[in-house]
Amino acid sequence: MSSSEIILITGANRGLGLETARQLLKKGFTVILSCRDSHKGNEALQQLQQEGLSPAFIPLDISDPKQVQAAYAWINNQYGQLDVLINNAAVTNVVNTHRSERESNTLLSGDVAEFKAIYDINVWGTLELTKAMLPLLMKSLQGRIINLSSELGSIQLQAATSSPVYHVKKFGYNSSKTLVNLITIYLQEALRETNISVYAVSPGWVKTEMGTAAAMLEIPEGAAIIVKAVTDKVGAGSFFTHHLQMIPW
């Protein structure tokens, strides 16, 4: 595997996305940071540059088809191919809502408009970007699509009363990750005869802005499994945790 491989990371201005970029840059990969807020993206770019690293940055709201196409055109013009797509961008609830996450994410108290807003980014944005990048990934010797998922998206774990995540019933977010898992399964089958492998990775409960300070894992620990999927190409077509344990769909 060439250390000059080109990697696009969505939601890379903070948390897992930023740390994943940092670890991959230190391994010699060419990393493109992307996020929807250009100011925050440039701050992340400058932070990594101050650490002696050299990423690129492009503004990218994955729920905006025009920005998705602009990202494709920029990467095609700059590099001519893409080796790894890391679908990290996601939201747990509706951005700028005046309701609490619990209110907007619960099946009975949330409404369809709120669930749709979550799906626009976590599901349809992820799918639109992935499909747009396929021609560039096809040019790679070993293309990889890494979808950031969650154990909360496992139907089996959500249904089992003995599961540690049984009582976490955030319908909007959880069901969006269930669909990300389904996208992973379908893509792996559709691309079986190509050079592209597809992965679903649950980095665990990480101390990010989304995961909160109550989480069990530090950000570098969560990012490490994403990096491992890139470098070791483990678990193609499957859903696994930061311990490399398989998770039931």
Feature roles, as predicted:
Residues 2-32:
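Canonical Rossmann dinucleotide-binding motif of NAD(H)/NADP(H)-dependent dehydrogenases/reductases
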Residues 27-43:
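Conserved glycine-rich Rossmann-like NAD(P)H-binding loop of the short-chain dehydrogenase/reductase
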Residues 38-39, 59-73, 112:
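The beta1-alpha1 cofactor-binding region of Rossmann-like NAD(H)/NADP(H)-dependent oxidoreductases
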Residues 51-54, 74-87, 91-95, 109-111:
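A glycine-rich helix->loop->beta "capping" turn
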Residues 86, 129-133, 137, 183-184:
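Hydrophobic positions on the long internal alpha-helix
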Residues 91, 95-119, 138-192:
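Catalytic loop of short-chain dehydrogenase/reductase
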Residues 178, 193, 200-201, 208, ...:
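C-terminal helical subdomain
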